[in-house]
């Protein structure tokens, strides 16, 4: 009897372990499949339909019950008639593509320190380049306080692809485009910004804590071995030298020069030495300094189109 009970308990343990492993495996497969699908999917929303819906809701909210009935009836009749006209037109013009109505593609970029949204931005831009017709435009609603230069450098390069294909790019800044964020914004053919948005901060910053004295105080040795004179300049735990600090600052200044040259190449009318001090300004002052082209929100820009 004990043998049967022990065997049943052993079998139950094996079954539980197998079920647990299978569950974990299925979760991993499901997540991987979801990521794979997500990588190649773009959500496309018609802003025309959205604003039309909002407008109709506001109109209806101001009407009496009788007025709503009349409006709904006439609106249904209009849609039905328009649908018939469109179907007749398409039947007669099977291969016709409407080239006369330019499209405004609206993209969003909400940047973090690593500019991780560049992954989706590159796919969106590739899709637009493949589909865009003559006179189509792109609006990028940008919000970023900057971050690592290689991340924002790549994001700026992605936006440059639109300019190279002669697709007009407008960047709108409703809140902030500073440092790496402005590196992206300056690529645009036209920059608009809200009055109190934060613009500029064309500079480079780096700060590193050093715990070497604390380690020495507690009798902790720290060894750092490198191959190459400047493989490591400033460190967190090692002892930093004067030469290392000078090299670090030299690299920092060189990066700033590259940043300035890039911004100036995109906006030649800027007094680059005046605006590249690392300062930031509100939208109204940024307009005076030619960092932007117009005071306007993204909402006004979209509705005007």
Curated annotation (Swiss-Prot):
CDD domains: S49_Sppa_N_C
Its EC number(s): 3.4.21.-
Topology with respect to the bilayer: Multi-pass membrane protein
Keyword Protease tagged: yes
Active site: 179, 231
GO CC annotations on file: plasma membrane
Keyword hit for Protease: yes
Record's protein name: Probable protease SohB
